[in-house]
Amino acid sequence: MSVSVAFEKARAEGRGVLVGYLPAGFPSVDGGIDAIRAMVDAGVDVVEVGFPYSDPVIDGPVIQRASEAALAAGVRAVDVLRTVEAVAAGGTPTLLMTYWNPVERYGVEAFARDLAAAGGAGLITPDLIPDEADEWLAASDAYGLDRVFLVAPSSTDHRLAATAEACRGFVYATSVMGVTGARDRTSAAAPALVERVRQATSTPVAVGLGVRNGEQAAEVASFADGVIVGSALVGCLLDGDGLPALRALTAELAAGVRS
């Protein structure tokens, strides 16, 4: 199921989309599936499943810790795809967030085939740019998958337009420079970046990197189509509070995008 369904539904309801990230295989494969399901039950509209990777260039310390734990426990591509399948079976659009190396190792066409077979909506590829994505563009077209690329405040107008044009599902706007992580204040650069993207495409724009509470989610949803939350949600599992804390934070964020 394409994530566009979630954006259309939210737009009809006059609210933002809540995109929630958790890595596959943390705290275990089954435990990770349970956590994502809890997040969905508490109000996440689109799930972003992380593919743990050993060299995560934009992941902040919280997501790195969870990914390292998953890798140490032996999580593999088959486990990641099983996670996607289990979550997508519930009817929630489910994207996979992955660095490009694991997809290349698996085989781009084969990965697209198996992701589609698992019910996955598509990929978010933080270290792949459209200029270097010919194989993925073809495979995503062949299997009807969404493809989400990232834009940043530093993106030139030409790069931003080309990236937005290549996206399907939504455009991922990184609201701050640097690695991921919850922050006390959302970036002042985010509204201007969203406006630049909207001048280039009619595809929805979701903002990630930094949101940690309902108030910030409401702020971002006031100018963007979607709010992406990762580190704050992963932190609920890392800090030992577990599913109750995850449910509570997700419900707060879901209320924020609806306010």
Describe the role of every protein-language-model region.
Residues 29-39, 155-165, 200, 207, ...:
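Catalytic cores of alpha/beta
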Residues 195-203, 212-259:
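Alpha/beta catalytic cores of nucleotide-metabolism and tRNA/nucleoside-modifying enzymes
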Residues 44-56, 118-124, 129, 171-181, ...:
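Glycine-rich phosphate-binding active-site loops on the catalytic face of alpha/beta enzymes
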Residues 1-21, 84-88:
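N-terminal amphipathic alpha-helix/helix-capping segment at the start of soluble metabolic enzymes
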Residues 63, 71, 150, 160-199, ...:
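Glycine/Thr-rich beta-alpha phosphate-binding loop at enzyme active sites
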Residues 60-95, 138-152, 188-205, 246-259:
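Alpha-helix-loop-beta-strand connector modules within alpha/beta enzyme cores
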Residues 72-75, 119-132, 146-155, 160-161, ...:
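Catalytic beta/alpha-barrel core
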Residues 35, 40, 46, 51, ...:
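Active-site beta->alpha loop and helix N-cap motifs at the rims of alpha/beta catalytic domains
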